[in-house]
């Protein structure tokens, strides 16, 4: 096949390729990517660009280029969420919920609930990199106490005191503003949300 023409730019040490992902991914080596983070077309609007891609072709390339311990993280919204999970149910693991600050279905609020969330779906073959981005909470001290053998902990004796300075593991619901912060695309996702997901599922210098 003829190599497609690509516009390549270097930004902050990263190479940017402009083109159809189904043209670019075949040029990439097998098992070379640690994280695929994509905001695919949902097929939920009348916009010309909002057409669902061929998911069979997409998964063929995703499965080929992703590392065995890599993560595939895809934004979605119903009914596209169900379609996307069903297209690769064996690799689907769990979802995050992006809680918005502004609802998006303005024209339908008299007929259905105001929509304040989207889904973020996580797929992988084997346990990927997971760097939990700790959240702030109330500090506490877990006092020493006796413990007996149980289902989870077979140890017996005195459990040491645990001091927590307020860090909490992240919940599956993350709130980020979807207000217009100079965005140039009607469905553009918050930059901070994308940063959060990149930090969670990859390390510095990963591809």
Language-model features, listed with the residues they occupy:
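Core catalytic lobe of class I
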Residues: 1-207
């Amino acid at each position: 096949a003829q190599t497609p023409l690509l516009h390549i730019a270097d930004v902050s040490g990263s190479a940017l390729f402009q083109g159809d992902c189904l043209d670019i991914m075949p040029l990439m080596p097998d098992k070379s990517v640690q994280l695929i983070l994509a905001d695919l077309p949902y097929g939920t609007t009348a916009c010309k660009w909002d057409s669902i891609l061929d998911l069979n072709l997409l998964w063929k390339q995703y499965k080929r280029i992703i590392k065995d311990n890599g993560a595939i993280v895809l934004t979605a919204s119903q009914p596209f969420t169900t379609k996307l999970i069903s297209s690769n149910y064996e690799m689907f693991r769990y979802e995050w919920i992006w809680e918005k600050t502004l609802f998006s279905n303005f024209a339908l609020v008299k007929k259905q609930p105001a929509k304040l969330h989207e889904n973020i779906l996580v797929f992988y073959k084997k346990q990927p990199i997971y760097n939990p981005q700790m959240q702030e909470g109330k500090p506490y001290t877990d006092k020493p106490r006796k413990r007996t053998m149980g289902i989870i902990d077979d140890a017996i004796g005195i459990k040491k005191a645990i001091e927590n300075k307020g860090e909490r593991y992240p919940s599956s619901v993350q709130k980020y503003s979807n207000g217009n912060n100079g965005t140039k695309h009607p469905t553009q996702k918050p930059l901070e949300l994308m940063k959060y997901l990149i930090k969670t599922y990859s390390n510095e210098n990963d591809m």
